[in-house]
């Protein structure tokens, strides 16, 4: 019981992290700007001249005026710009949020680096490989084929801003930082909607995404910390890879309210969740909880999670946001793939003396397919084809040079083949390749004011050799002996550890 209470106590080493003075340091905002340059998603990139405007004095005046009066309240007549120190008011709110996000990430980054260095000493994994989207699929491929049921969970988002502030109260000990964060969030709420709920999951407003994603991740970690604690306590077999994946999304947070619960009836509570084959994965505002247990056990987990979110976070969380599905009878949209566990039947003939037997053996296999209908819908939205999949020209690219047009189409095709290299069946990818190739030909023909047949006859079919996918090139170099018959290799799944994001088709440059 002492170990449980020690786990739930706030870390004493974090009690002297005074972050408020760092807000007034100019180099913090410069580092945040450089960090955004590296990640290519900083709000400050839209305002490259801010370095000449931002200074210690401006930040101090801005925070002072925030406390003195409601300078962030925007009238209905002028919802975009107001005169505030001669600049856009929204721009300065974004600057402070970028700087504050960079500051609060410092303790987490130091803790993550120390944990990764301890793992790297054992040469278990490379930390940058865990950043790849494909790093999750080998884990699912190795474990999900042995499981029976899965909980599909739609993670609730905090509807109250105070919940976001309280997730950081255990390690941010200076009251000034918490007060500034609380005040800034409530004032920013009047400017823009922090979270929009148009989609079934969650989505943040385009401004200040890094700041609010940090708050959201810290909130989600507090939700997950109890589950991870119960999972580790109920099983004596701790997987090293599981611990590595946990460090990837590690955020410090403790739950004091559960101390009394564990102290009173911890053994009974622990017995309900004792399952050594429990696996958890979070992605895109959703999470899945898979187990080898029975339907009754998964139903207990479902009601436990509902009660936990309702009691601890005061959220109105309904049971309809959690669905129990059997892996063998259910396919799910997971990170752009249609993943499922299907039975692969195999017939074995056994000969014993004069008698022979036919043994039907079914093996579970984790299957990943390319969702053709959503993918064609994305191509149609980007004006590469119709909703039925018929290729059309791209008029907005007809003013470019021939090499640029071919390069853009080829880059999209190669990226799609690269991301969907883990598909069990590549036939869908070759259909997408056909759509993009013919769309490219029609775009070039439109530019030269001729038909596709006439253009290809005049230019030669070698003009579209750009569509030799990167997967085919890599496989031909990796397996030179099998270059003549790579059909068996094409059917195998290949997961790459260099895919860090998924871009919209319309934004490919």
Curated annotation (Swiss-Prot):
Keywords, ordered alphabetically: Chloroplast, mRNA processing, Plastid, RNA-binding, tRNA processing
Family: Belongs to the intron maturase 2 family. MatK subfamily.
Gene designation per UniProt: matK
Residues annotated as signal peptide: none
General function of this protein: Usually encoded in the trnK tRNA gene intron. Probably assists in splicing its own and other chloroplast group II introns.
UniProt xrefs under Pfam families: Intron_maturas2, MatK_N
Protein name as annotated: Maturase K
Organism: Nicotiana alata
Principal place of residence: plastid
Entry's Gene Ontology molecular function annotations: RNA binding
One GO cellular component term noted in the UniProt record for this chain: chloroplast
Keyword Chloroplast: yes
Example GO biological process: RNA splicing
Tagged with keyword Chloroplast: yes
Localisation per UniProt entry: Plastid, Chloroplast
InterPro entries xref list: Domain_X, Maturase_MatK, Maturase_MatK_N
Cross-referenced PANTHER family: MATURASE K
